[in-house]
A protein has these predicted regions:
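Short, contiguous alpha-helical
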Residues: 5, 9-13, 17-23, 28-71, ...
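Acidic/histidine-rich alpha-helical segments that form the ligand environment
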Residues: 75-111, 117-139
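Serine/threonine-rich low-complexity intrinsically disordered regions
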Residues: 2, 71, 77-78, 102, ...
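Active-site rim elements
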Residues: 2-9, 79-81
């Protein structure tokens, strides 16, 4: 097992688990919630995070970050079960790819379009993307008057 999996993967697992717990308290109808203004629906926010995860997962395979992927599956952002299944697949694929890296592979660089960073740093930035998503989602949950799980209060605020 590589150093990242031993020392840091728990952060990714933890952020994925927080997202899973959020989806567990939502209904399909909740995904249509929009707090107003130029914001997207909660379901669209979840779909967007999945597209971001897809970009990061693919970058671990191609060593290039490509942000253009859009999941066009009809009804994805209106179905909690579809989102759960998609995230489960994305999470598993990313973990399998990361587990296959050697410690030396963690130093390989990933082109992010104008600059590059090591695989290990790319994974750290992915954790930050997850935390940003969870912060956004917490605003939606608060606007919906949903209680935040205890770990959200500790990690996100």
């Amino acid at each position: 097992m590589n150093r990242y999996m031993q020392e840091k993967w728990s952060w990714i697992d933890g952020s994925h688990e927080m997202r899973t717990r959020m989806l567990a308290i939502l209904s399909d109808g909740d995904l249509a919630f929009n707090p107003g203004g130029q914001n997207m629906t909660l379901g669209a926010l979840c779909r967007e995070m999945g597209e971001i995860e897809y970009a990061y997962a693919q970058s671990l395979k191609t060593f290039t970050t490509e942000w253009s992927y859009r999941n066009a599956e009809t009804g994805l952002d209106t179905s909690v079960e579809r989102l759960k299944a998609w995230f489960e697949s994305l999470d598993g694929g990313m973990k399998a790819t990361a587990e296959a890296f050697s410690d030396e592979d963690l130093a390989k660089t990933i082109d992010r379009g104008g600059y590059a960073m090591p695989v290990e740093t790319q994974l750290d930035v992915y954790v930050q993307a997850n935390l940003i998503f969870l912060g956004k989602a917490s605003i939606y949950l608060k606007a919906m008057d949903r209680p935040l799980p205890k770990d959200w209060q500790e990690w996100i605020g």
